[in-house]
Amino acid sequence: MGIKHLYQVIAENAPDAIKAGDIKNHFGRKVAIDASMSIYSFLIAVRSEGQQLMSDTGETTSHLMGMFYRTLRMVDNGIKPLYVFDGAPPKLKSGELAKRTARKAEATEAHEEAKETGTAEDVEKFSRRTVRVTRDHNAECKKLLKLMGIPYIDAPTEAEAQCAVLARAGKVYAAASEDMDTLCFEAPILLRHLTFSEQRKEPILEIHLSRALEGLDMDRKQFIDLCILLGCDYLEPIPKVGPNTALKLIREFGSLEKVVEHMESDPKKKYVIPEDWPYQDARELFLNPDVREASHPDCDFKWEAPDIEGLVEFLVKDKGFNEDRVRNGAARLQKNLKTAQQSRLEGFFKPVARTDEEKANLKRKHDEKLQEQKKRKKEEAKAKKEAKARPRGAG
C-alpha cells in the first residue's frame, strides 16, 4: 500500500522533486527493484479476458509472463535490474496484513457471487481484489531470474528498505517500487512505473528525496512523521486527517509527539487517535529498519549470460510459453546485457552540491509558486460562491 497521498503532497508542494521521462533515459543504470510489488502488479495486470494467464495444467503464469517480458524491456533499454524480495514482515505490520487478508477473503466471496449473478465488470473487479503473492509465485520468479542471468537478493524484512540501502551506497542508481514508503527508508532516488508495460505509455517517474525534503522544508524525521500521519502500512490512519491536514499539522507542530498532544488536549476532540497507535515504533521501523549493509556478502550480485535451454525447458515445456518468443527473448537478453556494461558518463563525476544562494533561489521560486496556487484557489472559491449566490436565470 505504501503512504497514502504522498505523491500528491510532493507534486503539489515540491514539484522540482519529480522528473518524468522515458525509459531510455536510464540506459546504463543499475536499479534495485522491489520484487514483491512487481509480481503483485504482474498478477493484476497480465491478463486475458479479465482472467489471469494459465498453463495447460491450470497453473497461473501471469507472474512469469510479466517478469520475463517486463525485465526484457528494461534490459532492451540498457538497464541492469537487480530484484530484491521481501523477507518476514515486521511484527507491527501484522495488523495491516491481517486486515488485507480479511479484505481478500471478502473479495473472494464477492467474486464467486459475481460469477453467478454479476456483470463481467463485477467479476473482473472482485477478481483483482483477491490477488496475493504466494511463496510459489516468489520461488518460480526466482527460478526464472536465475535462468535469465538476472541477479536477485532476499531482504531480511522489507524489500524497499534493502533497495534504499543499495541506492545510498551507490551500488545501484535508484530503488524502483510503486510503494512511496521507499522514500521513508531514505532511498535517494525512487523510480515508479519502471515495470509497467509499454502499452500503458506511462512515463518513468524519478523522485528525488533531497529535493522533496527541500521543497517541503522538512528534515527526514519530520518527513517520516508526515508519512505516518498520511497513513502507512504499520498503523491505522487517524479519521478525518487527509493530506492537507497532515501537512498543516506537521508544519504547525513540528513532530508527531506535539501533534498527538494537541489532538488529545483539544476539548472539541476533532480528531480521535486509534486506541492502539504506536507511532514511535512505526517511526523507528523507518529510521532503523532490519537491513543488511551494502558491504554484506549477501548483497553482492552480478549479471550472467542467460541459460537459453534452461529457459526453454522451464517456460516452454513446463509452462506452455511460445518457444520462438522465448528463444528470441533470450537472444535479446544475451546481446543487451553486454551492451548495458557501457557506463554512463555521470558515473565518472560526482554531482555538484547546490550553493546556499541556489537553494535560497529555489525556495523563493517554490514559495512564489505556492502563493500563486493559494491565490488561484481563493479566487476560484470566491467565483464559485458568487455563482451560487446569483439568482437563477440571472446573466
Curated annotation (Swiss-Prot):
The keyword Cytoplasm does not apply. SUPFAM superfamilies: 5' to 3' exonuclease, C-terminal subdomain, PIN domain-like. The keyword Mitochondrion applies. Residues 353-389 have a biased composition (Basic and acidic residues). Binds 2 magnesium ions per subunit. They probably participate in the reaction catalyzed by the enzyme. May bind an additional third magnesium ion after substrate binding. InterPro entries: 5-3_exonuclease_C_sf, Flap_endonuc, HhH2, PIN-like_dom_sf, XPG-I_dom, XPG/Rad2, XPG_CS, XPG_DNA_repair_N. Its EC number is 3.1.-.-. Mg(2+) 2 binds at D179, D181, D233. GO terms for biological process: base-excision repair; DNA replication, removal of RNA primer. Residues 122-253 are annotated as: I-domain. Mg(2+) 1 binds at D34, D86, E158, E160. Structure-specific nuclease with 5'-flap endonuclease and 5'-3' exonuclease activities involved in DNA replication and repair. During DNA replication, cleaves the 5'-overhanging flap structure that is generated by displacement synthesis when DNA polymerase encounters the 5'-end of a downstream Okazaki fragment. It enters the flap from the 5'-end and then tracks to cleave the flap base, leaving a nick for ligation. Also involved in the long patch base excision repair (LP-BER) pathway, by cleaving within the apurinic/apyrimidinic (AP) site-terminated flap. HAMAP family: Fen. This is Flap endonuclease 1. It comes from Aspergillus flavus (strain ATCC 200026 / FGSC A1120 / IAM 13836 / NRRL 3357 / JCM 12722 / SRRC 167). The gene is fen1.
